[in-house]
Design a protein with these regions (language model features):
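GIY-YIG nuclease catalytic motif and its immediate N-terminal context
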Residues: 1-60, 64, 71-87
């Protein structure tokens, strides 16, 4: 069974959320049921649940790892928006 570390973006508040799940679709749907503004912007898949939990913990505890990932996500979103503007 695969395990996932994911990042959601709240389109209304621009807040990012880090989570862990073994069923990514179901977990994202649960977030969206509470607040439809959440959207999946990034995820990592792991064969080991322990590895995924450790990665989630690292991102939440170590500011440099989370900061690096946030910059990566932001660059990706900026490029996507630029592409959408050209269409």
């Amino acid at each position: 069974m695969m395990a996932y570390v994911y990042v959601l973006l709240n389109a209304r508040t621009q807040r990012l959320y880090i989570g862990f799940s073994t069923n990514l679709k179901q977990r994202v749907a649960a977030h969206q049921k509470r607040d439809a503004a959440w959207r999946l912007v990034y995820y990592e898949a792991y064969a080991s649940e322990a590895d995924a939990r450790q990665r989630e913990r690292d991102l939440k505890q170590y500011g440099s790892a989370w900061g690096h990932l946030k910059r990566r996500i932001q660059r990706s979103l900026d490029l996507r928006r630029a592409g959408e503007a050209l269409i």
